[in-house]
């Protein structure tokens, strides 16, 4: 709260609220999209603790948005920096399996839906204007190509063991 208050009072500061970010450089051992891509490339099933809807923003879009924001006035000090289309984890896993050709399937461990983690990006689009967000399919395709290019540097044993899965919070 105190940081948000400081940002509100300082015209040189901007609070960009990120709801989900994916792309090269994130920790593939536990970040869902990257972890699922590496699992799919291994031919493993994609395991989801519980389905949930997210606003995942591709890193290249984040960079382009920040560049645009550096070149304009900010009528708002706090903005959600999210894509226009939200997506659930099962749908992401289906796209990942299609893009990678993985036939091992998708497992959801707990029924129901977890708490949605999305935001309204109307203020952002009001400031930067129309923006062409990378589709989830294209972002996943680019990320799969990236992981194939760094394959020998990945700790595949950790991906296979999936020690972070039990750290997921499940809504009962």
Predicted regions: what is each one?
Residues 39-43, 69-73, 127, 146-150:
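Generic structural signal for alpha-helix termini and adjacent loop/cap motifs
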Residues 136-172:
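Amphipathic terminal alpha-helices
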């Amino acid at each position: 709260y105190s940081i948000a208050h400081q940002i509100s009072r300082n015209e040189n500061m901007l609070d960009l609220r990120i709801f989900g970010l994916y792309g090269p450089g994130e920790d593939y051992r536990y970040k869902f999209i990257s972890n699922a891509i590496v699992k799919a490339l291994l031919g493993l099933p994609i395991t989801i603790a519980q389905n949930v809807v997210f606003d995942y923003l591709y890193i290249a879009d984040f960079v382009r948005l920040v560049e645009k924001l550096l070149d304009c006035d900010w009528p708002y000090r706090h903005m959600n920096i999210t894509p226009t289309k939200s997506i659930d984890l099962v749908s992401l896993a289906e796209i990942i399996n299609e893009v990678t050709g993985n036939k091992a399937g998708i497992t959801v461990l707990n029924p129901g839906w977890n708490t949605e983690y999305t935001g309204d990006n109307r203020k952002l689009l009001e400031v930067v204007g129309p923006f062409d967000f990378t589709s989830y399919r294209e972002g996943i395709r680019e990320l799969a190509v990236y992981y194939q290019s760094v394959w020998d540097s990945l700790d595949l044993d950790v991906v296979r063991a999936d020690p972070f899965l039990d750290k997921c919070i499940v809504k009962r």
